[in-house]
Each structure stands twice: as C-alpha cells, then as structure tokens.
Amino acid sequence: MEPEYYLDEKDSILWNALVGVVLVAVCGALSGVMKKIPAWALHLLAVLGAVTAVILGIRLARAAGAESIADQYYVQRAAMALADGDAEWVLAQDYYGIYPFQLGLAGSTERLVIQQVQAVCGGITLYVGFRIVRELSGSRAAELLYLVAELLFLPVYCYALFIYGESIGTCSVLCAIWCYLMANRPEGKVWQKGLLWSAVALFMGLAYATRNVLLVVWIAMVIMQILVLLRSKKWQGLPALCVVLAVMLLGKTTLCHMAEGQLDREYGSGAPYVLWVAMGMQENPDALKGPGTYNDYNLDTYLQAGYDSIEAAEVAKGDIRQCLAKWQEDPVAAVTFLKEKLLIQWIEPTYCSFNQTRYQYRPQGWVEDLYTGQANERALAFLNRFQGMVYLAVFGYYLRILLGKLKGVQVLPGIIFLGGFFITILWEAKSRYVYPYIVMILPSAACSMEYYGRLLAGGIGRIAGGIASSRERKQKQKEIGRTA
C-alpha cells in the first residue's frame, strides 16, 4: 500500500501578502454593498449553498468509486466482521466500535451509502458555519465571504469519500459550537437555554464517538465558560458542560457495551492512546514521510504486548521518557523535530484529502483529472493560495483578540484552534488531523477579513475625503484672491 509522502515546495510570502491585500480591499468594497441586502436573502443563499454542497459531494462520490484503504479499510472490515460476530478487528482498536453501528444506521455496509450521508454532512457544515458567522459578527459581507470560501474548499467534498469520522465528526462539532454560542446569548428563556445545552450534549456526544480527539472542543468550551464566569459572574454554563461531558463518555461507553453484546468476550479498552503520542515523537526512518508520522509503532507494540493495554502503555511511556531525555541533551534537535513535524501538517493545503481518497475503481474522466491531471495541479495551486489567505485572516483574528477588540464567546474559535495546534504537537503527524480545525476557524477567518476590509475602506474614504477637502480649501483661497 502506497505510503503518505510529502514534498517541499517554496512559496512566495510577498505574493501571498499582495493577494491578501487585494482580498481585503474586495471585502471592504463588499461591506458597503452588502448592507443593502436583506438578511433573509443571505439566509436563502446559505440554504442554496448547502444544497449545492450536498449535490457536489454526492456527484463526486458516485463518480469516483473510491476504494477503502489504510484506516478506512480497517474500519469497514471491522464493521463487516462484527456484523458476522467476529470481534478480532474491533478488539484491535476501540475506535472501530462506532462504525458497525454507523453503517448499520443505513442498513448497509456499502461504501457509497456512507459517502452520500457524509456528503449531506458537508452541506450541513456549510449552513451551520454560516449561522456561526451570524452569531459572531452579524456582518452580511462576512456571511457571503464565508459561503464562498466553504463552497470552494475542496477537502470538504473529498472527505465525503472518506469512510471515517472526519465528515460526521466535523459536522457534529460545528453544530455543537453553534448551539453553544446561542446558549450563551444574554437573552433567552431558561427552557430555551436548556434545549440548546441538550443539543450541545447530543452533538458533542456524536462528535466524540466518531473522533475522540474532538474532546479538545469541550475543553475549549470549559475555558470559555471560566472566562465568562470571571467577566460576567454567570456560572450556569459550567454545570451544563459537566452534563455534556457525561453524555459524551456515556455515549461512547454505551457503544462499547452494545459491541460487547455481539461478542463472546469483553470489548476491552483497545490500543492505549499513549502509543500514538510515543509514535509522534519518533524520527521516521522513511525521510520522505517526515518526523512523527505513522510507522506501525502503535499496532506493533500493542500486538507484541498480546493486546494488553496496560503493558503496551508502559512500553510507550518508556519510549517517551527516552525521547525526552535525548531532547534534553540536544535541544536544537528537539526544536528542529517539532518545527518539521508541525510544518508537514499545517502547510499541506489539501489536508490529506486527495491522498486519503485517491484509490478509486474506474473513476469518471473529470474525477481522474481532478486527482491526477491538470485539474489536480490547478486545484493544488488554488488550495495553496486559499490556505495562505486563511492563515492571514487567522493572524488578523488573533491580533484583534490581543488588542481587546473581541470579547466573550467570539474568542471560542481561537481557543479551539490553539487546542488543535497543541494536539498536532503531541499526536501522530498527519495533515488530516488539522482539517477539522480549519473548518472550525473558517467562520472567524471570514469575519476577520471583513473587519480589516472595513478598516481599509474607511481609511481610504478618510484619505479621499481629506484630499477633497484640501482641494476645496485651495479653490476657495484662489477665489478670495481673485476677488481681492
């Protein structure tokens, strides 16, 4: 099976900055024009955009005939085996446990069924992101910018083909964030807030069941509620988040017990997550894959421990201690390792979406072109520029936080994004793990671009007004001179 390689390509910071200035200027022009557009028109556009995203995702799924590879293969194999009472695949790793039931919801183990469901998740993600923009800023220009950006973000469609938790988990966690923002509105009745917090629990439970690492979002919400408590003395959110955590853990436990009902032995805890942390600290012997990337360490160690989670965890902890001792002796090597590990995850513009869905059975011509032809080259160039603009906007977003321009729940996406960044330091290195955090930060990035666009437009307006006033004064002085 072909491994995941990466290549270094130099980019122009100056060119990215120039494109960024042009985009900010366009946003500034849009800001004035969009004020005349009614809110319902943007809402209708968001619905149409969501439907378009669903259609495009389904169209790609039906035209690609994507085959299951790597983790996807194991997920599907485990689901099908468990349906026949074979527990071996599920026992290997606990996160497989969700997928037999995920596939069972559709009454089929066919890939296309799940891919089409995930395409629907892509449409829901777009619409919910639009509503998040409305909660964060209420700017119609920002809403339009977000809709365009999300529609053009190709990984959303590619991950509809990916039989794993990316599409469903990202969609669920975005829904949870939206409900969380509404629950923290200053207005609203108690029963309304209760329903919203219940929705947060439901969506976070689903997100956690599909992608455990999305626990980061719950932690960010707790930090946010502590900040709310310190600022406004409102404490109700913290007990609500305790209930949310209970639902998340109970949901995962329930799935495990449901799996045990189909097995002849206990489900077990699976491979301990510390194995992934230990693997993420290792130099990969395959230089083309980069440091901290997958090297079979986690499963090999777990198998050698005889599926004993405790013994495997002790081995991993020992390897982590050795690595930390080596870095303590050579801090420069540690910095170099971490720098390269972060770069191969955060500057890869497709976020592994093409790589993870590239195995296809008789794809249609346009799909083949998108993955291997000239369309692929154009897509990579576009996504590279897209990524540069997103990071530029994110930088502007954090600058606004530092300057005190953003307060309250507007800071939540920034806390989540930082949490995702720290996770990629600790975990196995793979740009796929960055994808959910890019989707979650896009609403704030759109708001940031629109904000600086308004600043630029206002500055240009003041300069133009000053020049016009100066000309008028000079003209009046000339007229006074002639009269005298």
Model-derived features: positions:
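Membrane-interface alpha helices of multi-pass inner-membrane proteins
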Residues: 147, 196-211, 222-223, 244-248, ...
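Extracytoplasmic catalytic/substrate-binding loops of multi-pass membrane glycan-assembly enzymes
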Residues: 61-78, 87-112, 268, 312-316
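Transmembrane-helix signature of polytopic, membrane-embedded enzymes
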Residues: 129-154, 171, 407-413
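Transmembrane-helix motifs of polytopic, lipid-linked glycan transferases
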Residues: 116-137, 175, 393-397
